[in-house]
């Protein structure tokens, strides 16, 4: 049973990490800035993983754009998602740039042999310090329009889309990396606003995966959405009809601590409805979970999970050197870099 996505300590693959990645519970890995020095190094690292680990691994990253962009040197500096609507006055131009950003991000990541970037962010508004300019907009209609184009750009390249952070992280001030946030708004308001982007994109068949928030919505349930069967099974699966994969957000984050120790967090998230669990920046916890976590599931559930996982691997890959000579890449690189520079100047 492959469930966990774990991380690496540095820029070279270590023997003990190969052994961890080959564990039956491990489905893939997520890369961070500490794993990246330059293009040649990251290509070598990923090639080492593919060659030395004797099973297919889903290799992932957070390459959203703006401040959440793990790899920078030698790659397009993607603009923050808020910049499209904030700096561009023409709605058609806003949508075109969102499409270009989705295409460019997916093209560069798949050229590096990465399967999936956890994008786009579908949270409404910019007041939450953990979200901020990662959000497209504060209005659901505008957010949906821009997210549609971003995803269509990703899909053109063959990368699956992951909507996050369900049912919406945008209206809490606390940062779930540091603590468990609470959203005290009425259930009716959350369903009328925050859930609408997820609902619309699921209905259009544009979301391949969803990542829930480590947020407790006090008027709906007493557990974080990432460990809540109400949010994941009743709302996401049954009410919204979502059939794709559900990733937990990083269970190493402080916001997940409400669910207990690391084994308890994995157990609760899996039982609540997550298919794949991220556990990052906690190497001792990874060893602990691999030793002690004993999921009890039917064979049918395991087959469904594996099917969902298999659909997330990249559908195609352009050679890195070839990509950088393509007219689309060159044009996107120029326009997106300029927009990000304008955004940084705008924010001062």
From Swiss-Prot:
Q: Provide any one GO MF term from the record.
A: beta-N-acetylhexosaminidase activity
**A Gene Ontology CC term for this entry?**
cytoplasm
Q: What class of enzyme is it?
A: hydrolase
* Positions marked as site (Important for catalytic activity): 175
| EC numbers on record | 3.2.1.52
Statement: the UniProt record of this protein carries the keyword Cytoplasm: yes
Q: What is this protein called?
A: Beta-hexosaminidase
Organism equals: Histophilus somni (strain 2336) (Haemophilus somnus)
- Identify the taxonomic lineage of the organism of origin: Bacteria, Pseudomonadati, Pseudomonadota, Gammaproteobacteria, Pasteurellales
